[in-house]
């Protein structure tokens, strides 16, 4: 979900590149860079952090030239810093590359290229591409790119500069979007239309593995065999805001539609598709550790907590490991029982959730093995976990309500369960391989679920005036109901609650009256009859019932449903990955029908603010802070934070040491 721009024309490239990158900021990023070529010399400028940092560097050290490429990076390999920022070059600086996507075999290629004498300066998979192109280069960059494609496994959108072709820009794509903008005397490239729309509304869409060769006079497109094809330009009528949303009305809807791609990326990053096995090192726990574990404690907030509840079900089932799931804001205050031999897993989309971060440090203090699952490389939680961090590959989420981050977190819970199940001897490799094979089909099945959208929209328009909505389910469906209910109340402001279906008779059924809307999640075949009996209980009291079920349960569910949404069949442990999609769409369309601000619900923000027990992000005034730092450093205290003190003790922090810097340094 990084941003790519490219330009060749008569104007100074740096200004157009920076403008294009600014129009892709909504995608999220942690660093940015540009490369401009002039007279066969490629010059780079890169900066960590906001685009303004890069713009300031370019302003003080301009990059002259009328051809260039640019990139905003969302880290997937290597932490966010200037070195890992794109563009990347070969050793001689003759080839520059920007890249979106994930090269799955980059470690293998990196080893091969090192053996040939290539020297790497970054931790990224992208630098591998630059060295590979240099190694393969035979004087014809088009044929070089085509040969490189046969060696690259994974997804990529590439823009390439070649010092030996100073008036040509090359780009190609596979499983990652890339758009070419056409105009007289100038051509443009963007990973998304907003980067181009100020300059041209005529675009050429590249198919898989096609290569576009851009010159000032025009664009030529070749298939992966090297055959040129005729251009098929289209005209774009979107306004800029609509372009940022990819033509969708809201980011939330766009991100729901991005879920199949996010599922595919996360799966590919952790599973060897040829062997259909978890990649070695994908999960930071050895077989010896897995077999010695007593318990696993999962701690998270909000949507991530609900992913953890799914994790409890699948890990206990497949790995036979006791799992406790706790709300991060409560964890520290219940005097948790953890020690060596226990494992702690923190889940956070942003990697900055303060309560979750504080819980991690408490678990670390108690001696547990601490792991983390996050979507953001280099985040506070990722840094705290160190080598024990796992990543989802959902890409940035702009909408406040999490959708694709949740679905990839659930996917990771299933993958972790399989990995632990094999290592603990409760799953044979053949059974695990078959389950992974079925998981590989989930992105395609998720695309099929999107066909329910018109039915969801119609139903929402009829029921958007409801004041209360209840979700029920059993087992995994109960965990799913919790997230479905949160999503609805979060964006539509409808009072919604989720209940284990068997608990209705213990009080909740008193709230059911004529016209009450009840959504029953019915994916677990072995529990279907019991859940349907609860459905009949609420129907007999006047409820309107919506049922979400797989094809295999269609006939049984249809008898009791006022509305039925049917998803494709899959293994029972994988069905939550499909069933969540229609209820996310339901929350979205209910909110739209009620006129709510879908992307920015009232009173909510994307990442949680710091817990009150944590220190301020900012130190005192610079002069006072510097003076205080010198005194405190001499005294052996933290030079930037109020350590020691009652606030820190209450937060459960430990004193820093030379081998262990201040745990709280990220807040200063």
Sequence positions of predicted segments:
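Conserved short alpha-helical segments that host acidic/polar catalytic motifs at enzyme active sites
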Residues: 1-245, 249-250, 254, 258-294, ...
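Glycine-rich oxoanion-binding loops at beta->alpha junctions
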Residues: 66, 70-83, 269-287, 311-347, ...
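Generic C-terminus detector
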Residues: 226, 252, 544, 557, ...
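Active-site phosphate/pyrophosphate-binding segments
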Residues: 259-263, 267-297, 388-517, 591-614
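Glycine-rich phosphate-binding loops that contact phosphosugars or nucleotide phosphates
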Residues: 288-441, 521-563, 586
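Short, membrane-interfacial amphipathic segments enriched in basic
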Residues: 630-643
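Short, strongly hydrophobic transmembrane alpha-helices
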Residues: 655-668
């Amino acid at each position: 979900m990084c941003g790519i721009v490219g330009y060749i024309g008569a104007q100074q490239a740096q200004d157009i590149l920076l403008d294009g990158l600014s129009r892709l900021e909504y995608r999220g990023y942690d660093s940015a860079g540009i490369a401009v070529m002039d007279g066969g010399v490629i010059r780079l400028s890169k900066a960590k952090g906001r685009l303004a940092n890069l713009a300031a560097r370019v302003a003080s050290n301009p990059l002259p030239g009328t051809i260039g490429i640019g990139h905003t990076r969302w880290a997937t390999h290597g932490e966010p810093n200037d070195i890992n920022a794109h563009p990347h070059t070969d050793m001689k600086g003759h080839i520059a590359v920007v890249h979106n996507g994930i090269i799955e075999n980059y470690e293998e290629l990196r080893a091969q290229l090192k053996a040939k004498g290539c020297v790497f300066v970054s931790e990224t998979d992208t630098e591998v591409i630059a060295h590979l192109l240099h190694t393969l280069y035979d004087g014809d960059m088009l044929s070089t790119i085509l040969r490189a494609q046969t060696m690259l496994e994974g997804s990529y959108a590439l823009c390439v500069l070649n010092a030996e072709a100073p008036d040509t820009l090359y780009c190609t794509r596979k499983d990652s979007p890339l758009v070419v903008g056409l105009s007289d005397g100038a051509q443009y490239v963007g990973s998304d239309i907003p980067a181009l729309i100020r300059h041209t509304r005529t675009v050429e869409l590249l198919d898989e593995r096609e290569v576009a060769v851009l010159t000032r006079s025009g664009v030529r497109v070749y298939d992966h065999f090297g055959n040129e094809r005729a251009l098929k330009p289209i005209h774009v009528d979107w306004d800029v805001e609509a372009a940022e949303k990819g033509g969708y009305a809201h980011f939330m809807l766009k991100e729901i539609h991005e879920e199949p791609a996010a599922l595919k990326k996360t799966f590919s990053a952790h599973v060897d598709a040829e062997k259909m096995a978890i990649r070695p090192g994908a999960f930071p726990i050895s077989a010896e550790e897995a077999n010695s574990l007593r318990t696993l404690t999962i701690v998270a907030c909000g949507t991530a907590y609900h992913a953890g509840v799914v994790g409890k079900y699948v890990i206990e089932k497949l790995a036979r490991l006791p799992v406790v799931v706790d709300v991060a804001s409560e964890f520290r205050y219940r005097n948790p029982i953890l020690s060596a031999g226990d494992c702690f897993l923190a889940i956070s989309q942003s990697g900055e959730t303060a309560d979750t971060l504080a819980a991690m440090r408490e678990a670390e203090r108690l001696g547990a093995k601490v792991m983390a699952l996050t979507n953001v490389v280099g985040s506070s939680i990722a840094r705290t976990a160190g080598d024990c961090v796992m990543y989802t590959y959902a890409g940035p989420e702009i909408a406040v309500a999490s959708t694709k981050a949740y679905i990839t977190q659930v996917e990771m819970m299933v993958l972790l369960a399989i990995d632990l199940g094999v290592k603990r001897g409760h799953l044979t490799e053949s059974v695990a391989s078959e389950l992974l094979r079925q998981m590989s089909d989930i992105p395609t099945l998720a695309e099929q679920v999107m066909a329910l959208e018109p039915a969801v929209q119609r139903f929402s328009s009829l029921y958007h005036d409801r004041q209360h909505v209840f979700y029920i389910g059993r087992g995994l469906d109960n965990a799913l109901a919790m997230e479905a209910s949160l999503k609805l109340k979060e964006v539509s402001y409808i009072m919604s609650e989720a209940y284990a279906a068997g608990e209705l008779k213990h009080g909740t059924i008193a709230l059911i009256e004529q016209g009450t809307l009840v959504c029953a999640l019915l994916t677990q075949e072995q529990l279907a009859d019991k859940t349907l009996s609860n459905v009949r209980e609420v129907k007999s009291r006047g409820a309107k019932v919506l049922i979400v079920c797989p094809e295999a349960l269609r006939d049984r569910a249809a008898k009791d449903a006022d509305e039925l949404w049917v998803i494709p069949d899959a293994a029972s442990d994988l069905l939550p990955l499909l069933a969540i999609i229609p209820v996310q769409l339901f929350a979205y369309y209910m909110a739209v029908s009620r006129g709510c601000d879908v992307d920015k619900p009232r009173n909510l923000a994307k990442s949680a603010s710091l817990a009150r027990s944590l220190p301020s992000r900012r130190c005192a005034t610079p002069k006072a802070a510097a003076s205080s730092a010198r005194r405190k450093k001499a005294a052996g205290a933290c030079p930037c934070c109020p350590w020691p003190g009652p606030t820190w003790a209450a937060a459960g922090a430990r004193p820093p040491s030379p081998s262990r810097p201040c745990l709280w340094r990220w807040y200063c």
